[in-house]
Design a protein with these regions (language model features):
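N-terminal hydrophobic/helix-forming segments and targeting peptides
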Residues: 1-378
Length: 378
């Protein structure tokens, strides 16, 4: 019996053909990331993949009035969180095996009236969501995702900057020759939240009629004209719209050996995707299997699409009712008897920044899944 614990490098212990399986999984995950730039797009991608793997809409299952071992169900909660359930042989009252992850990620949201003109440029005012290093958002290509509800009730889906033939957006920074004062500031103050203004245009609207008055804010006017022409929206529609700014880059392999992945949203879509593929492999479990994909973790799990909401509890209550005589006690027992794995990312040891971790107790890259015994410290 070995008395000492030895952490093993996964790469060194792969069996024949397992490297191909690892790389195939990585490529599927990268495709998932590219289709899941926001929590809304991620939820839609999860549902699409779930349907392809035999999962039925929760509301349609309720209409049938019955469930049985092996029934696969998905719940779409406001297009921002998803629950996937595979009914087990034992009753729900006996408990569930649950893996929970979150599908929101740090980003920039547009303010209610974001568009303005200054210095012959049109810009968008933003409000950062989650914990962001503000300086990291300057001078990188950005894409815009969102939905707009117009006055006549139409829902318009917008995505700009993801395809090669589409424009991208930028947040400006100072050139080095003018940065003397900025460079003296603390890193956290070099770029402020109020400076995270997204450049969306520079070309002014020019009046064809020479007799017509000069257009006020002609660059802003031109951007509004483009938006109206392409999507049928006006400035007032921004109030009811939901727009998110995220990095436009696609997921890429990192390293000459393609052993790592660069992408926005690893936290926590890496765990979300693992939970997704895992439940797709479940057929008729002994205990009901659940994968949860929830929103708003980055800002404290508040709101009706987060884990603080009742959407999952309500779902389980309805499913228990389909299994027989309903009672609140059965719902309480179902949760009390359940086992839950909270699947989120943690930090791996980085030799460039060794001072932030206790190396003897740090997760090592390439050494498999990590269990975090404590968290929350900065």
């Amino acid at each position: 019996m070995a008395l000492k614990h030895e952490s093993k490098n996964v790469w060194k212990n792969l069996k024949e053909n397992e490297l191909d399986l690892v790389m195939d999984y990585a490529n599927r995950y990268m495709a998932f990331l590219d289709n899941s730039k926001t929590e809304r797009r991620c939820a839609n991608e999860i549902i699409k993949l779930a349907k392809n793997n035999g999962f039925e809409d929760y509301n349609e299952v309720l209409k049938t009035g019955k469930i049985e071992p092996g029934t696969k169900i998905y719940l779409n909660n406001k297009e921002k969180s998803v629950a996937l359930v595979v009914i087990g042989k034992q009753s729900l009252e006996s408990g569930m095996n649950i893996v929970g992850s979150h599908i929101d990620a740090p980003r920039l949201d547009l303010k209610p009236f974001p568009l303005y003109e200054d210095g012959n440029m049109a810009l968008l005012k933003t409000h950062y969501y989650g914990g962001v290093k503000k300086y990291q958002w300057t001078c990188i290509p950005l894409s815009l995702h969102g939905i707009v509800f117009t006055k006549d009730g139409n829902k318009i889906d917008i995505s700009i900057g993801e395809n090669q033939d589409e424009p991208v957006f930028y947040i400006n920074d100072l050139l080095i020759h003018l940065s003397a004062d900025q460079m003296q500031k603390k890193l956290s103050e070099g770029i402020t939240g109020e400076q995270l203004n997204v450049v969306v245009g520079h070309r002014p609207m020019i009046s064809i009629d020479s007799e017509e008055k000069e257009i006020k804010d002609p660059v802003k006017e031109n951007i509004l004209h483009i938006l109206n022409e392409k999507y049928g929206i006006i400035e007032e529609d921004f109030m009811l719209a939901e727009f998110e700014i995220v990095p436009a880059d696609k997921a890429r392999h990192v390293g000459l050996d393609s052993s790592m992945i660069s992408a926005h949203g690893h936290d926590d879509r890496v765990c979300a995707y693992a939970g997704l593929e895992a439940i797709f492999d479940v057929e008729i479990p002994e205990i009901t299997a659940v994968s949860l994909f929830v929103d708003k973790e980055e800002i404290g799990s508040v709101g009706n699409t987060s884990m603080e909401s009742k959407f999952f509890e309500n779902m389980i209550a309805e499913l228990i009712a389909l299994q027989g005589e309903y009672s609140d006690l059965k719902v309480r027992r179902a949760f009390a008897n359940s086992k839950v794995l909270s699947a989120d990312v943690t930090v791996g040891f980085d030799p460039t920044f060794p001072e932030v971790l206790d190396k003897k107790n740090a997760a090592m890259i390439g050494h498999g899944v990590t269990i975090s015994k404590y968290t929350g410290a900065r």
